[in-house]
Amino acid sequence: MSVLGEYERHCDSINSDFGSESGGCGDSSPGPSASQGPRAGGGAAEQEELHYIPIRVLGRGAFGEATLYRRTEDDSLVVWKEVDLTRLSEKERRDALNEIVILALLQHDNIIAYYNHFMDNTTLLIELEYCNGGNLYDKILRQKDKLFEEEMVVWYLFQIVSAVSCIHKAGILHRDIKTLNIFLTKANLIKLGDYGLAKKLNSEYSMAETLVGTPYYMSPELCQGVKYNFKSDIWAVGCVIFELLTLKRTFDATNPLNLCVKIVQGIRAMEVDSSQYSLELIQMVHSCLDQDPEQRPTADELLDRPLLRKRRREMEEKVTLLNAPTKRPRSSTVTEAPIAVVTSRTSEVYVWGGGKSTPQKLDVIKSGCSARQVCAGNTHFAVVTVEKELYTWVNMQGGTKLHGQLGHGDKASYRQPKHVEKLQGKAIRQVSCGDDFTVCVTDEGQLYAFGSDYYGCMGVDKVAGPEVLEPMQLNFFLSNPVEQVSCGDNHVVVLTRNKEVYSWGCGEYGRLGLDSEEDYYTPQKVDVPKALIIVAVQCGCDGTFLLTQSGKVLACGLNEFNKLGLNQCMSGIINHEAYHEVPYTTSFTLAKQLSFYKIRTIAPGKTHTAAIDERGRLLTFGCNKCGQLGVGNYKKRLGINLLGGPLGGKQVIRVSCGDEFTIAATDDNHIFAWGNGGNGRLAMTPTERPHGSDICTSWPRPIFGSLHHVPDLSCRGWHTILIVEKVLNSKTIRSNSSGLSIGTVFQSSSPGGGGGGGGGEEEDSQQESETPDPSGGFRGTMEADRGMEGLISPTEAMGNSNGASSSCPGWLRKELENAEFIPMPDSPSPLSAAFSESEKDTLPYEELQGLKVASEAPLEHKPQVEASSPRLNPAVTCAGKGTPLTPPACACSSLQVEVERLQGLVLKCLAEQQKLQQENLQIFTQLQKLNKKLEGGQQVGMHSKGTQTAKEEMEMDPKPDLDSDSWCLLGTDSCRPSL
């Protein structure tokens, strides 16, 4: 029984290390299988679906590619590192899996964030954080011999050292720190990546000895082939900072040999310009490049140097602030295994209006440079791409004098989308267009404005002149980051991350909500009741809306045609109705007519407004002269209109209002238009009836011909711009489908796993870097590797690979075929003496799996094996004495006897296992029978008790209409009179 238990224990250990989905070895008993089934099913039912849309390929390598994806749940950008495992060697495969292990351990603002990994057939997909600023290598090349400012170098140095400190505290040696592996965001936030060569050490005194890394950044100890530790990473950091200071590689040569010589001798390519940089910074870099590893500082010691210590808190706060917009929480556990749904879509931007009734597709903005947000102004358009770049151009009708609202540094009329180069390096999250100006918000919450400052919409008290031709930052919000911005024709309103509202610009009709009609040229804080949490701001041409978390709407400004929804209809006692009109309001007032709905989106136009509630229903109010309310007529409407008709039963997801027209998109991928169709406003030629000089339609009419999903939509004046997407195909990828779970991989790489030494030092061995692993993960347990190498040669394992009687599993057979050759001992006695006490604990597994294979191998291999192992043969004398080595004649027969004995033990164990399974089945059957009898007895007892109680009650109070026989028929047989 103990032998069988050890056998099963060892199989479980191997299966767990190799990611086996079975709970144990061999045939599972009914109990465990039954218990695993519901658990697996329950896990599958709870799996989260994550939806991704591919954007473009960032780069290709020999074994895969990196692709940019947009995750639709939070509209974030991620990178999928796709690795074709079939094209990798076993070492390269382990490196890929090792990167997952390392990244899963690390969580730091200056380290590339790992989100998930998936398996698509034989392709490993690693989901990582996207850095939109390229890498440090390209950043240095773009300098073109213009040295960095010391402040920028110190900023980079602090972030790099902070990341290295984090990985070293986790016991991880990076081993490939270089400028190509240091990534940047557009806000100059450093992200240290590429952990494929990283290694986990047991302690700060542990050493490694495998030759890995990039030659230009190798430390002297690596070049000399001696053991190295965390100080090797510090050397690489010194090389990177030296490169930042000189824009040249620290060590350079024409061939690797000369390069190693220069590294060992400390012959640098050039020296740092001491007139450009402080002595303290230069000395810090030189200390990292000390030839003696012991003299190099640790990462924590570098952070404690005065140059970094005096600004450490300030830079830490800056890193946290810059990282906040893109920071995404990790899953609570690594075992949740979500499902990835990858949907390929075409993404296009269309514009119409201004005399063009046919939608015009923009070729500049398309897949690969797709749009995430669009905005229309009276004279121009603006688009933010998925990579957070801003494009602007004039609208189609043109002819209007520009005031710099395009932000290109001039007043030229660019009729095609043009990238605003002055914002290069800034990640633009949102843009809003006014009449002749533009305001945008970055990921960091900073505000940039450009265009006309006639009404003070630049927010800088008119100090920049009447026109601003290039994006200008509003320093007012440096310490109070902005969440959202909205522009009217001549005013601006913003919502900060602290949920505060600020407004400035033209104050006519009280549109700023500041209790006056004064114009303000700098941002002014708006008083909002503290009980209300504002979640969105939206400006009309001469009014403003605030949307609260509870779905309430506050409005201020001009309420002409009741377009703010502020008018009240009151009923008297004797059917007398009074209609109270509010012409305008200078402070934010609750729109009571909208209080019956929980509003989620509001879209003001020039004369009317549309809103979407939490149920996807569309509401309209305001002027209905051209049928823009979509109610099927052109009559004046006093209140709020809940749209039915063509939109009845549909969920509206996007809506926008222009000058006397409305465009809406539904969740079933339809686009509707209604209202004034003049000058191409509706992208169609309505035939309902002429209305004055314009062509109008009062019912929502479908446009665009085919089904399109609309991520964003904007109307202003006569113009409309929208993003349309069509699904090409969709694919579902289930995470960890082949057992490549993080827990599995890390279990094998942990100190207790395969290959780890026990003396406090963990060393890279040649076997670790070259021994193949057919499982796709790391090797198995240390006991299994030792035992197999000591008892079976690859030749013998191959000889039995096709045998019908072999019980060796396929994965184990492949392991044996690729195992290192170790000679076979000559006789049973040395064989048994070769095992230590710890190895004897797992001997049954070796006997069951290994020796059975060895016993059936061709015997002609045995003399060669024995002749090659004089160390284990007591009959062979020392080679140094010159005595010829002759194998004993009885060795083969002795070994055969030992093998036969072990075969008998195998059969005995298997028979015992089968017997135990049969006994378990019998016991289970008996228990079921006993349970049934027990339940039957309990039911009879309860029934008898109830009958006896009823009989006693009958005797005490007999019913006159029932005789004793009929009463007894309601009970059990025990109450019948005996015949």
Swiss-Prot record:
It catalyses: L-seryl-[protein] + ATP = O-phospho-L-seryl-[protein] + ADP + H(+); L-threonyl-[protein] + ATP = O-phospho-L-threonyl-[protein] + ADP + H(+). SUPFAM superfamilies: Protein kinase-like (PK-like), RCC1/BLIP-II. Pleiotropic regulator of mitotic progression, participating in the control of spindle dynamics and chromosome separation. Phosphorylates different histones, myelin basic protein, beta-casein, and BICD2. Phosphorylates histone H3 on serine and threonine residues and beta-casein on serine residues. Important for G1/S transition and S phase progression. Belongs to the protein kinase superfamily. NEK Ser/Thr protein kinase family. NIMA subfamily. Keywords: Acetylation, ATP-binding, Cell cycle, Cell division, Coiled coil, Cytoplasm, Disease variant, Kinase, Magnesium, Metal-binding, Mitosis, Nucleotide-binding, Nucleus, Phosphoprotein, Repeat, Serine/threonine-protein kinase, Transferase. InterPro entries: Kinase-like_dom_sf, Nek9_STKc, Prot_kinase_dom, RCC1/BLIP-II, Reg_chr_condens, Ser/Thr_kinase_AS, STK_NEK. The lineage of its organism: Eukaryota, Metazoa, Chordata, Craniata, Vertebrata. This is Serine/threonine-protein kinase Nek9. ATP binds at L58, G59, R60, G61, A62, F63, G64, E65, A66, K81. The gene is NEK9. Residues 892-939 form a coiled coil. Activated during mitosis by intramolecular autophosphorylation. Activity and autophosphorylation is activated by manganese >> magnesium ions. Sensitive to increasing concentration of detergents. It is not cell-cycle regulated but activity is higher in G0-arrested cells.
